């Protein structure tokens, strides 16, 4: 039937139909129908997403999809965001850029996350891709403003330059002046991560000559008194990240900012607010009724002033804020913002055990009751109860992402002193479409039994300081059918769960374990048993087989790959394949010889 159907349509028709299929997993399914569909999909694929840059080689991707226009790559594991991945681990993008520079000369978009990007990479991008339009560097490192200057000077069709949360070496603030005077195509510019000043005159000229600029996110070095000037040059902005605020309130600055913002009739997103002075907040009230996104995660504004601001934002769909909002502010959010989809509450003092704000579980309960469209939560707090989690689960069965971070590890239900198993069990039982879950607090193997039983659509699970034994990890790996990424730290999970579920690991993107009970011997056995997996032991104490095989390793990163062992492993990373024992023996002999 599939064969007859495939033969009944001309290739041009199928190519047109396939162009409407956006999800990678759906396109992958299409390519499996028959050989002709495989070939058509292969030649008409324009976008490629690779969640692990070591899962496949650049050459393989280029052979498989010869006409790609957009590439998205991820490098380091997610736990790198919490400094759990040692410096120098890897994630180098240069081999990809080098391969694509000769084969994808028509490439238009590159999006990178947690990768090492050098100035040489950026210069090669600028030189190789003549119609290059989009560069997104999210949480990347290794490059400087010299590399950005090469992009600015050469990429004449660039529409998007986004450096979100990247670590950039600010060699010079004049790199923006490298955009040619004839350049007018910019739509998105995010330089919020830069630490040093940029040339304001160059920034002003750039903003003035780009009529399609929709998103502008400035760094804190851009003073508030100059923001009004930029807004007057770009009243068409839809998204704005403010610069730094001045310590003293100046009436002329307040008035100028208020007037300039009132002229931005399309503005829907606000962020920045570094060192925001509460007296300046009323200047943004004129745009609040249109706001759908508000990022206050850098604003040390107290609850009283936040309440006044949020009460002006009835259309808000996404809010990022510090815990200064407190329960009272979240109650106002719940009563005002009925269209809220995403809430992230970050800690103002993450390393202080004593509560410095009035934020409890009740704030999140209020939002779950008042915001019927809420589907994504990241919530840092210092206390939680099973009853609150059960209420949240029943209020919001539409939740797809739930990440709860209790500041103190292994904190129980503070009212009953019981583990939080029942509460998280309710989350996975009631939220049928849950895709991402982060656990915290006192948890036993029972919660993992709940997860394995109910979380059938969960794709990513993050676990820390939880569980009793290997049984907990076994419940997850054997029960969660859709699991792609599992990251674990400081848990008693070890060899039995790892080896018993070896075949499950081949269906996942990756497993990260640090400070657990996994032995070097188990890692070596897994590597020998599963050739399609890269089992990487990360141990800064020296070669792992210089210690007994029963000795736990510091970290292990396991991922599915069709590329085999990588070639850029530093001295503290060892790949456990069938030849590992021989290599280790030679390494020890060589080291001893020295």
Language model features by range: what are they?
Residues 80-83, 94-99, 171, 175-185, ...:
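C-terminal capping region of solenoid repeat domains
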Residues 11, 26-44, 56, 65-66:
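Short helix-loop-helix/strand-helix junction enriched in hydrophobic and basic residues
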Residues 44-49, 377:
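Acidic/glycine-enriched edge-of-secondary-structure segments
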Residues 47-51, 70-74, 109-113, 136, ...:
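Short, conserved beta-strand segments within well-ordered enzyme catalytic domains
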Residues 1-33:
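N-terminal Skp1-binding subsegment of the F-box domain
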Residues 89, 96-196:
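A generic tandem-repeat structural signature
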Residues 24, 39, 49-108, 120:
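F-box-proximal linker/hinge
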């Amino acid at each position: 039937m599939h064969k007859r159907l495939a033969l009944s349509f001309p290739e041009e028709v199928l190519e047109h139909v396939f162009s409407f299929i956006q999800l990678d997993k759906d396109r992958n399914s299409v390519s499996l129908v028959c050989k002709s569909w495989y070939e058509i999909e292969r030649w008409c694929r324009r976008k490629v997403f690779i969640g692990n840059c070591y899962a496949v080689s650049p050459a393989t991707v280029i052979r498989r999809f010869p006409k790609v226009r957009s590439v998205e790559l991820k490098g380091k594991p997610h736990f790198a965001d919490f400094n759990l991945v040692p410096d120098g681990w890897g994630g180098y993008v240069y081999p990809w850029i080098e391969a694509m520079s000769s084969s994808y000369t028509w490439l238009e978009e590159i999006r990178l996350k947690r990768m090492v990007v050098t100035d040489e990479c950026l210069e090669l991008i600028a030189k190789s891709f003549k119609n290059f339009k989009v560069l997104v560097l999210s949480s990347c490192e290794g490059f400087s403003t010299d590399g950005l200057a090469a992009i600015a000077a050469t990429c004449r069709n660039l529409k998007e330059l986004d450096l979100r949360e990247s670590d950039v070496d600010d060699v010079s603030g004049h790199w923006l002046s490298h955009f040619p005077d004839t350049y007018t195509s910019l739509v998105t510019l995010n330089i919020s991560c830069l630490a040093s000043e940029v040339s304001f005159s160059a920034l002003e000229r750039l903003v003035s000559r780009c009529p399609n600029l929709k998103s502008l996110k400035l760094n804190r070095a851009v003073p508030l008194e100059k923001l009004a000037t930029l807004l007057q040059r770009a009243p068409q902005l839809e998204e704005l990240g403010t610069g730094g605020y001045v310590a003293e309130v100046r009436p002329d600055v307040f008035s100028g900012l208020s007037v300039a913002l009132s002229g931005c009739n399309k503005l829907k997103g606000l962020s920045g607010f570094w060192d925001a002075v509460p007296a300046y907040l009323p200047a943004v009230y004129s745009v609040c009724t249109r706001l759908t996104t508000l990022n206050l995660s850098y604003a040390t504004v107290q609850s009283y002033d936040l309440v006044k601001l949020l009460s002006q934002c009835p259309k808000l769909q996404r809010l990022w804020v510090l815990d200064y909002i407190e329960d009272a502010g979240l109650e106002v959010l719940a009563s005002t913002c009925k269209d809220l989809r995403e809430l992230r509450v970050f800690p103002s003092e993450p390393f202080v055990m004593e509560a410095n704000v009035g934020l409890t579980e009740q704030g999140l309960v209020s939002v779950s009751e008042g915001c019927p469209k809420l589907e994504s939560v990241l919530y840092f707090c210092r206390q939680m109860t099973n009853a609150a989690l059960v209420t949240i689960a029943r209020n919001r069965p539409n939740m797809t992402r739930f990440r709860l971070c209790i500041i103190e590890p292994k904190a129980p239900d503070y009212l009953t002193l019981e583990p939080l198993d029942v509460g998280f069990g309710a989350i996975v039982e009631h939220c049928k479409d849950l895709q991402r879950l982060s656990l915290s607090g006192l948890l036993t193997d029972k919660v993992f039994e709940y997860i394995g039983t109910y979380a059938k659509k969960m794709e990513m699970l993050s676990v820390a300081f939880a569980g009793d034994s290997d049984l907990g990890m076994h419940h997850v790996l054997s029960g969660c059918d859709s699991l792609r990424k599992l990251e674990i730290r400081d848990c008693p999970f070890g060899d039995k769960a790892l080896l018993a579920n070896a075949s499950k690991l081949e269906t996942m993107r990756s497993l990260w374990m640090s400070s657990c009970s996994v032995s070097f011997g188990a890692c070596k056995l897994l590597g020998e048993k599963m050739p399609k997996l890269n089992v990487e032991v990360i141990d800064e104490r020296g070669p792992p087989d210089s210690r007994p095989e029963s000795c736990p390793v510091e970290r292990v990163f396991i991922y599915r790959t069709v590329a085999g062992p990588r070639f850029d492993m530093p001295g503290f990373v060892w790949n456990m394949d069938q030849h590992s024992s021989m290599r280790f023996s030679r390494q020890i002999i060589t080291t001893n010889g020295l």
